[in-house]
Amino acid sequence: TQTREESFDFLMNQRFIHMKLGFTKEGLITAIDDFSIADGGVQGSSGFGTANDQGYGPYYTTKCLNIRQRMEIIDSNTGKMYLSGQFCPFNWDTLTVGLHIIAEKLNKDVIDIAKLNLHGPDSQEDDRVVPSFEACIEAGKKLMNWNWHKAGTKTLPDGRKHGASFRYQICPRHAFSGYDCKLEYRGGQIHLPTQGPITGIFAIECNAMVIAEELNVEYDDVIVDYHWSHKFTPVGGGSDGTTASGWAMKECANILKKNILEQAAYEAENPPAGGMFGGPPQANPLKGYKADELDIAPHPLAEPKEAPAPGPFAAPPVTGPVVYVKSDPSIFKSLASAVSLELVATFSGRPPAALWSLGMGKMLDTMNTCYCEVAVDEEIGAVEILRLGVVADPGKVIRLTSMESQVDQVMFFTQGCQLFEEFIFDDKTGLRLNNNMIEYKKPTVLDVPTVEKDFRETRSGNAVYGASGLSHSLANTHLVICAIYNATGVWVQPPATPDKVLKALGKI
């Protein structure tokens, strides 16, 4: 067992980027030249965050077709990276910085520069607006009371400099995960057999919510059965964990619902024989109705048309899920008594391919935006984040607490890498000196401001209920740095510690 001081996850190695942009006097980007030198760790590391950047990055979300990207990778022998990239996600904030530079040079709002350059839903030649992006911008400006100003021109009452910044991203769904779903009906309840999460993506409850929604029963009527031998697990790359597995589970739930209603219609015409001590079979109010004339409800929707006959074998009042006649909800029977047999439904598959995986930025559906306000004390170099705001459109929010936690997590990353986290190297040997979690400074819960959130639901995605999810797409490397630039007019290499701020200001 390692102590906190002995343990260290190097996570992401260093990367140096030199980007050149050409743009018109209106701010439209006409040329992009990106050269990177990246540390791959050791030979055999994943190219997820290095070579993959050449196919997916922020540049393809713009109307610019004149793009050149080059990368050299060195191996510093720091460790093997099985999946993590250099930036999270990728090199997105090169464009974020570029948009702020253009806005400052032209004395224009950075949001207006972003809107001018963003292409439409279908291609880089598409001049239409992206509805999801427009919805996020409208709500974001209102949330933050957005009022852009030129760098270094706004001073707060306490004498500190005010700065603000903006960033957009795609809400990605990775679309490389397939699922083998199974549902069982037993005694009026729905059972979901699963081995549970295996990579920290705890989407089981989200799947249960989808099942309850599709079958129109209460969440408590869906029983999750955990066992290592069950095949289904709702994992997947990034946001696939919930949205893609939810799509597959939705298909499975509808198969089970069809089976339940068909069995209810069959048993109404062919009632099970009464037991020796159970009395004669009760009259079935669903008799004479076909499966497509029936539906399921979480509870009776009306008083029964005919009161149950009195006597020792009279059925108790129905309180749980029921099968009812769609044309007359007063005709119903409890789900448990309407279907006596055990039923099983299975589905194997995945949702349609996501735009993220098909176009890598060249097609757009669901998007997100984030905003930052800072106060910079130019006398001592201290930076305070005044506000962090996120307006995201995941298509459809499946479970609000999960979405909120996803946002809080990535904004924690955001603040940490831009204000606290720093590698310290020995000048003579090049060795990293702070290889532990005490000397590598991460923010604590006392350091991170409350993130103001507003979620849009345009249903623009193509996973369950039009969702795409969020993944780590809001994690960024330069949102705070851009706000510091807007406050002071100087660029600070992250992390923006007081000494670095003062050095950038020319005071030390």
What role is predicted for each listed range?
Residues T1-A135, K142, K150-I508:
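Cofactor-binding beta-sheet edge motifs in enzyme active sites
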